[in-house]
A protein has these predicted regions:
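Conserved catalytic segments around the Walker B and adjacent sensor/switch elements
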Residues: 41-56, 61-62
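Sensor-1/coupling segment of RecA-like P-loop NTPase cores
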Residues: 109-110, 121-145
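Walker A/P-loop nucleotide-binding motif
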Residues: 19-36
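Conserved small helical "lid"/interfacial subdomain of P-loop NTPases
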Residues: 153-174
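Phosphate-binding P-loop
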Residues: 13-19
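Conserved P-loop NTPase "ATPase switch" module shared by AAA+ and STAND
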Residues: 91-114
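N-terminal pre-P-loop "Q-motif" helix
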Residues: 1-12
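Conserved NTP-binding/hydrolysis module of P-loop NTPases
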Residues: 55-93
Length: 174
């Protein structure tokens, strides 16, 4: 029998051609990062990961990593108070501009600013897919849902519910 992570990964792979924006949410240790890593490995394509980090001083900074840099264990320095689209543009100049998968980690932090920047970021990569990863938060989920971002939970759905929705081809909505 498949594990919960494998079932969710199967759903994401199956639906990959249909979603443009997806919010993968779950508590710490629920497998969100593992799922994102598996999607990166699927096609061995370039992936850009943006991680929003909030320091103890309350300042937000983006850390931008492409797939090669992540494999080497190095990270670019963070820029404080810069917009997501600007960091994405910087990353695109360093990597393949046809990057198909953009992962935005910690999307629950400062989510309204992410939503503001997302349209500009999408215009930079018109054929890309954006996978937002974060913790469950009703306000964040509601705001993302209003923007048409598909929600996928790693923790609240039972394996049976997820398998049933895969078999029926239904959209998972929480």
């Amino acid at each position: 029998m498949s594990t919960r992570r494998e079932v969710i990964l199967s759903w994401l792979r199956e639906k990959r051609q249909t979603w443009r924006l997806c919010y993968l949410l779950g508590e710490a240790g629920s497998g969100k990062t593992w799922l994102a890593q598996q999607l990166q490995k699927d096609k061995h394509r370039r992936v850009i990961t943006l991680s929003l980090v909030v320091s103890w001083q309350g300042k937000a900074a983006w850390i931008v990593t492409d797939d090669n840099a992540a494999e080497q264990g190095c990270r670019d320095s963070a820029w404080t108070r810069d917009e997501m689209a600007g960091q994405l543009l910087h990353a695109l100049h360093r990597t393949d501009s046809r990057c198909p998968l953009i992962i935005i980690e910690n999307a629950h932090l400062n989510h309204r600013r992410i939503l503001d920047d997302l349209q500009r970021a999408i215009s930079l990569i018109p054929d890309g897919q954006f996978l937002l990863i974060g913790r469950p938060d009703r306000k964040v989920e509601r705001d993302f849902k209003k923007q048409g971002i598909e929600l996928v939970s790693t923790g609240r759905l039972t394996e049976h519910e997820l398998k049933a929705s895969i078999l029926e081809g239904q959209n998972i909505d929480q």
